[in-house]
Amino acid sequence: MENLTNISIELNQQFNTKEEAIRFCGEKLVEAGCVEPAYIEAMIERDQLLSVYMGNFIAIPHGTEEAKKLVKKSGICVVQVPEGVNFGTEEDEKIATVLFGIAGVGEEHLQLVQQIALYCSDMDNVVQLADALSKEEITENLAIA
């Protein structure tokens, strides 16, 4: 996977709601200097417009089109959630065990989403990320993508 110079990896996280999970991803992007704090609200708004759940136990929280002006540099936050977090409803659960919070300058945003979606379309890759015991293991798995 290309363009992973600004990457934050968080292992063994737990969230009660998808909003809490999205905010966590956004905060990591802010801490990395990738986005302005207002980008976090745009990530919540984006999920309300169209779910950021992608299937295969993966969610890709990211901001709205209008929030691109809040992106300082491209970055990604990989968050492992062993117990999962529901991005669906009680009736139609959509459990994510790996989150990819992303911010992309210009068209890099779309490229990041496409790269992650392609990589995670293989369940073996998702399992490796979900079961990784170290940040280095996740970095290695993503580097070969």
Swiss-Prot record:
Signal peptide: none annotated. Its main location: cytoplasm. CDD domains: PTS_IIA_fru (cd00211). GO terms for biological process: phosphoenolpyruvate-dependent sugar phosphotransferase system. The keyword DNA-binding does not apply. GO terms for molecular function: kinase activity; protein-phosphocysteine-sugar phosphotransferase activity. Residues 2-145 form the PTS EIIA type-2 domain. Keywords: Cytoplasm, Kinase, Phosphoprotein, Phosphotransferase system, Sugar transport, Transferase, Transport. InterPro entries: PTrfase/Anion_transptr, PTS_EIIA_type-2_dom, Sugar_PTS. GO terms for cellular component: cytoplasm; plasma membrane. The keyword Metal-binding does not apply. The modification Phosphohistidine is found at H62. The active site is at H62 (tele-phosphohistidine intermediate). It is found in: Cytoplasm. It comes from the Bacteria. The PTS EIIA type-2 domain is phosphorylated by phospho-HPr on a histidyl residue. Then, it transfers the phosphoryl group to the PTS EIIB type-2 domain. The phosphoenolpyruvate-dependent sugar phosphotransferase system (sugar PTS), a major carbohydrate active transport system, catalyzes the phosphorylation of incoming sugar substrates concomitantly with their translocation across the cell membrane. The enzyme II CmtAB PTS system is involved in D-mannitol transport. This is Mannitol-specific phosphotransferase enzyme IIA component. It comes from Enterococcus faecalis (strain ATCC 700802 / V583). The lineage of its organism: Bacteria, Bacillati, Bacillota, Bacilli, Lactobacillales.
